[in-house]
Amino acid sequence: MSETYYEAINWNEIEDIIDKSTWEKLTEQFWLDTRIPLSNDLDDWRTLSQLEKDTVDFKSNYDENRKEPVVFPTRTPNLLINGSSGIAVGMATNMAPHNLSEAVDAIVAYIDNRDLEIADLMKYIKAPDFPTGGIIYGYSGVKDAFETGRGRVVVRSKVEIETDAQGREKIVINEIPYMVNKVELIKSVVALVEEKKVEGIAHINDESDREGMRIVIDIKRDANSNVVLNKLFKMTALQSSFSVNNIALVNGRPRMLNLKDLIHYFVEHRHEVVIRRTQFELAEAEKRAHLLEGFMIILDNLDEAIQIIRDSKNPEEARTRLMERFGLSEI
């Protein structure tokens, strides 16, 4: 008996980075070998169970040794809430994540009224919802992204200026922009201090724990904490931008999508999935009803049916005679 062992990986992109391709290959192989998805999301389990109900089309994988779904029959707008990032020949996509509750509210509103404009949908989805937090600095980039599918969203770290018992000020960082690595951020601040490009910093310490992030920058007594902070915003990733480029495949072709487009195509996808699932379940129910009707006919004429089977030379002859005698048909 051969066994495959899978190494557990704890991945936190804020702390450090691993090769995403390795992780994806590992999870894909684990799924193919065990049929157990590496997720606790209930929607994932329901999604996988619906694959067997002809809800989506299948295609051959890269070496044509098995079939894989073209898309998943998901019940959640994953592209909108999770975002996406990728590069292809001559194009790239970079989609921001959004809040699930806001996205659901916007989708429900759109289903109720297909004539809603982007401005109406923006009453439900206010802005991207980055998992690492931060503060969106300015709204024009968000508005551009929602209206055109392309925009530059500026995100600042969430900071507080505290004063200790000795009267010394501290810059406390509680949240950092999306896709910024905490370790690299601290290294960049240290480098600026060593190169004397930023003055007034006495010490920097990472006090983060399971309760949350806390990077503490001690300010010298003769320095102004606001001046230091503004320099850090300008010279480090404490302030960074997320360039939105909403390119996604629509019917196999790349398209630039605004907010309404993203919601529209998700609703259309769900509509198709529900119809195909219902058609599959109806066909299965009709097959079952057909069998039960046949069983009822045979049970009502059980002795004669048994005699026909005994008198037949082989199963094929028995099947033919039963069908002719009782008006049965194949599925």
Residue map of PLM features:
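Long, charged, helix-rich clamp/arm modules that form nucleic acid-engaging surfaces
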Residues: 1-42, 129, 165, 177-178, ...
